[in-house]
Amino acid sequence: MQVEGIFPNKVTFISILDVCSQRKYLGEGKNIQLCKMGFELMSDVSMCTAVINMYGKCGYLDDAIFLFENFEEKDIVLWNSMLALYSQRDEFKHVFRLLEQMMCEGFMPTKISYVSVFNVCANKEALCRGKWVHASLVNRSFGTDLEVGNAILNFYSKHHSLLNAKCMFERMTERNVITWSGMIAAYAQCGQSKEAVQVFIKMQQERVIPNEITLISILRAFDDKSMLDDIRKTHYFAMLEGLNKGVTLGTALINMYSKYGNIKEARSVF
């Protein structure tokens, strides 16, 4: 491109940095960053966000933090990128510190911000803070937003707070496979097998197609040998839908069959 005399612009560099968001390409990404800094374009917030995302995805959080803290003209996209990086590393204290700092600097959290917050609140130490954030969303326009709602449902599910998870599920005006799978998981984790199966059936009645995560969640609800037929039905459903080749689901099926002494059927999963 450059040999042909075409000078790469900001969009070009951002696209390349996105490709470099894999550890094996990090060296190339750093070279691009230095090249860009040489052209005095690292003052651009979009470029800075792309570089921070690259470092974060490659596991170089310290480098991402350094760039973030030394960049003056932050926008909400940059704040959200940093929140997401902390959230992905389960750094819930840093997430809340950054959230407070962001608001103090005049940036109101968006739904993307809240998804990061609730994802990190699955940490057992963050239950009270998560409830406080949820309460603050009651009168906000995206309090029942699909993506935010799924994150809240997952938050309550991981804390075994079944009543709150159920209330969130019922309040959501839009539901997708993640929503239904989350509710099934909530019931399964609390040992309510019958309710988990009912949600699984209703999900299909609503024409929502279960995925691998759904089936793994419903398998966890089959906590009694009397439910062996349900395990077989789930296995058969997975085969019909072409989901039986997934390693995680296959492992779950093997474990369930083995748990109830059905070694022959466990081997059949292979």
Regions found by a protein language model. Name each.
Residues 3, 7-14, 19-25, 109:
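Hydrophobic or amphipathic alpha-helical targeting/insertion segments
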Residues 5, 38-40, 71, 75, ...:
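Inter-helix linker motif
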Residues 9-14, 29, 44, 48-49, ...:
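Pentatricopeptide repeat
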